[in-house]
Design a protein with these regions (language model features):
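A generic structural motif
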Residues: 46, 97-99, 428-432
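Conserved serine DD-peptidase/penicillin-binding transpeptidase domain
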Residues: 13-16, 65-333, 449-450
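Beta-lactamase-like hydrolase cores
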Residues: 2-47, 111-116
Length: 451
């Protein structure tokens, strides 16, 4: 039997009242997929901000449009003459939006170039980022936190998510705080003004400030917080790429006499090699397990790749492609707003019912295993790793979460006590939404135990 608004379980009503969230701000939709039985339907057709649950739309559209074995490429060419181990001219690197070009993969790419016999580059290294035809992205615009990687914009030649790993270590012997970063850059000076504290670790100063040319960490850091690691995007993509390129190229025994510059690959340039990314299915795990926004943006833009025959893609072209896809699966594009594919948006809108239809299509698809395996497992990994760890629900579901100011969402698949698979969606849009995890927890528990 479907539970309507008037029949909502008392436990859920209690959690809503405790959180100060009216039922009008909540959308619920749940289906027993094996019995084809509607379990919950409350405000399910109300368009709401889905936050990162929008990544489910990006995920399924990518699997169906690009295919599970889609690979991004990075193309290496040169202009001038290659004699013995010396390139008398420019090395050209054209990016096509590979979102998996980590430090390790970038090292492999540069090592491939070295293995083709190039050691000395007498000209410049030209980086062609033109495949993404997008305007300048301001990383401060969304919430004023430009160093946080979730605010990073797409880049057709993105290296290592443009990130620096910062490790904060309390030194109990000397009662001070140490900071380490990797990789290191001469252009970035991290200034440590953190002070030792013995207070409870309910929060820690994880948002540095830019003071002149220094990135400053300041405030009280509790020794009870232990070692903390966080990633930051502190350099422009152009500068980050240039510094990493020079550092690794030198480690490989190479040299560059010119500069590392942005430019355009010419049709007359001589092809050297292609570097292929991990397959889409591998990258989707990074996207959903860790809710990686820039990966979502890259996948979203790449949806327009095939229809443009390898020409540059844009946000407008990607939106047109996803609108066509939504229409093809029976959803109305006019009722859904997909701004950038990541869910990091104030204007994105979709209903719980429509997300339910996306999940239903994924469940019915031959690509169902690839889709579901990309989602975080309850109390096991990704954004669900710390959720419901000491409950019977551990490992019993794959759930995508969403988090923005005024928004908390969750959607995915849950096994109930009878080992039947349930489709679950819960959207909460309200100023007090930050208090809503107990609501999600109670919903999942009730569905697990009572349905």
């Amino acid at each position: 039997m479907c539970v309507s608004q008037d029949q909502l379980p008392q436990q859920l009503r209690y959690e809503l009242k405790t959180a100060g969230i009216p039922l009008e701000a909540v959308s619920l939709y749940a289906v027993n997929l094996e019995k084809n039985q509607l379990l919950l339907d409350v405000n399910s057709k109300e368009p709401r901000n889905p936050a990162s649950v929008m990544k489910l739309v990006t995920t399924l559209s990518a699997l169906e449009i690009l295919g599970p074995n889609f690979h991004w490429k990075t193309e290496i060419s040169y202009r001038g003459q290659l004699k013995e181990s010396t390139l008398f001219g420019d090395l050209i690197v054209k990016g096509f939006g590979d979102p998996s070009l980590t430090l390790e993969q970038f090292w492999i790419l540069l090592n491939k170039i070295r293995s083709r016999g190039i050691q000395k580059i007498k000209g410049n290294v030209i980086i062609d980022r033109s495949f993404f035809d997008i305007p300048y992205h301001n990383p401060s615009e969304f919430d004023g936190k430009p160093f946080r990687p979730y605010n990073l914009g797409p880049d057709a030649f993105l290296v290592n998510f443009n990130s620096i790993k910062v490790t904060i270590v309390p030194d109990k012997k000397n009662k001070n705080i140490k900071i380490y970063s990797m990789p290191t850059f001469k252009n970035i000076k991290i200034k440590n003004k953190l002070k030792w504290s013995m207070r409870s670790c309910w929060s820690w100063p994880d948002t540095p400030k830019l003071v002149k040319e220094n990135v400053v960490f300041e405030g009280l850091y509790s020794s009870k917080c232990g070692v903390k690691q966080r990633y930051y995007s502190m350099l422009s993509p152009d500068l980050y790429t240039a510094e990493i390129f020079k550092k690794i190229w030198k480690q490989l025994g190479g040299s560059i006499e010119g500069q590392i510059l942005n430019g355009i690959k010419n049709s007359s340039d001589s092809f050297l090699l292609d570097h292929r990314s991990f397959p889409l299915t591998h990258i989707l795990r990074t996207l959903n397990k860790h809710s990686n926004n820039v990966t979502a943006r890259h996948i979203f833009l790449t949806l327009a790749y095939e229809q443009n025959n390898g020409k540059s893609v844009s946000t407008e072209k990607a939106r047109a492609k996803i609108s066509t896809w939504l229409k093809s699966i029976g959803l109305s594009p006019s009722e859904i707003i997909v701004e950038n594919g990541s869910g990091l948006s104030r204007i994105s809108r979709i209903s719980a019912y429509q997300i339910g239809m996306i999940l239903q299509r994924a469940w019915d698809s031959p690509l169902m295993p690839e889709f579901i395996s990309s989602l975080p497992i309850i109390a096991t990994d990704g954004t669900m790793r710390m959720r419901m760890r000491n409950t019977d629900l551990k490992g019993m579901g794959h759930m995508k979460t969403g988090y923005l100011k005024g928004t908390r969402t969750i959607a995915g698949f849950l096994k109930n006590k009878k080992k039947e698979t349930l489709l679950v969606v819960c959207f909460i849009n309200h100023p007090k939404a930050k208090n809503s995890w107990p609501i999600h927890k109670k919903l999942l528990t009730w569905l697990y135990e009572r349905t």
